[in-house]
Each structure stands twice: as structure tokens, then as C-alpha cells.
């Protein structure tokens, strides 16, 4: 029995990758359809052809991209509910959504992300690598960006840390589990615009950082908040 349990964790984690992409693709296309309908109605700015051609779609169609990401979130949550119910046979909340310590974890994660970005920004300013020119304050864009990054952070942390890392820990020690889950986290961004090997390496390191707290707490609130803060700031 122990041998079966040992193999089942890593196998479940790896086999979940294909349905993850399938569900993500299907629900993102549903989101594109909804955004297209809203664009034709003049409610938001959206054109399917230019969206696919845009080098940075989020910049040009922020509202549409936010809608698409929330449909992605719905799809991935549906997939994870199915997997937890019929494969893992555990409650969905066991992914790491315990409410204990939720507020403190969120505050700590948001604060740490802000501090890390502030330190990095200050170092680059000091070294002359970047130069502050101006600050473009657009409340609508800021709110949409925040909502967008909430969806991105929740999807990626719930799947990579809450499901993949959780199952890998059933088979391997924390170090091996962190390495494998971080590699998967990095590769999930392989098709992102302008991604390169340096970016993938940075994502791998970020995956380690985001996964460490989950290993010890089995709670997703801190890595979600840190991921959100990292992206937003």
C-alpha cells in the first residue's frame, strides 16, 4: 500500500498538466467570446483580430483580458474540484483555503511583495539601470490591473502550489517537491510574450520562494498574496 501511495502523488501531479491546459484553453476562449460580444456592443474596447496580433494585449485591452482571466479561473477551479472529488477524494478546501490566519497571511504576503519590489527598484535606480520619468495615474487601469492579477495569482497558486506541490509532497521530500513544482511553474510561462531563459530561471526561483511557505503551512493565502503583490507592484 505504501508503494502505491508513493507513486500516486507524483503521477497525479504530472497527469494533471494536460487537463490544466485543456480547461484553461477552453475557458479562455469562452472569455474571448464574451469579451468579443461586449466589444461589439461597445461596452468594452475589444477586437478579436487585433487582440491576437497585439504584442501586449493586456495593455491595449485591459478590461477584456481581465474578463478572460476570470473565465480561466472558473475553468481551473472546476477542474480542481473534479480532481479533488474524484481523484484525490478530498474536500476542495484541502488545497489550502483554510480561513485560519488568512488575514495575517494576506497582509504579510502583500507587504513582502511590495518590499521586494521596492528594494529591487531602488537598486536599479542607484545603479542607473532605470530612470524615473513620470507616474501615469489612471484609477480605472489600476483597478483592472489589480483584479486581473488577483485572478492570475489565484489560478497559478491554487494549481501549482495547492494541487501539484501538494501531491508531489506525498511522494517526495520537500526539496525535491519544490524543485519539480517550481520547474512546472516556470514552464507554464514558456509561451508568454518575450519570455527567455533568464525569465524562466527567475520564475523557477520565484516558484521556490512561493512554495516554501506552502510546504510548512499547507495554506495558499500567503503565496497568493505574495504573487499578487509581486505582479501588481
What positions do the PLM features span?
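Membrane-interface helix/loop boundary segments of multi-pass membrane proteins
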Residues: 155-180, 212-219
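Hydrophobic alpha-helical transmembrane segments
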Residues: 10-18, 67-70, 106-111, 142-143, ...
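Membrane-embedded alpha-helical segments of multi-pass membrane proteins
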Residues: 70-78, 139-147, 155, 201-208
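Small-polar-interrupted transmembrane alpha-helices in polytopic inner-membrane proteins
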Residues: 117-120, 173-190, 204
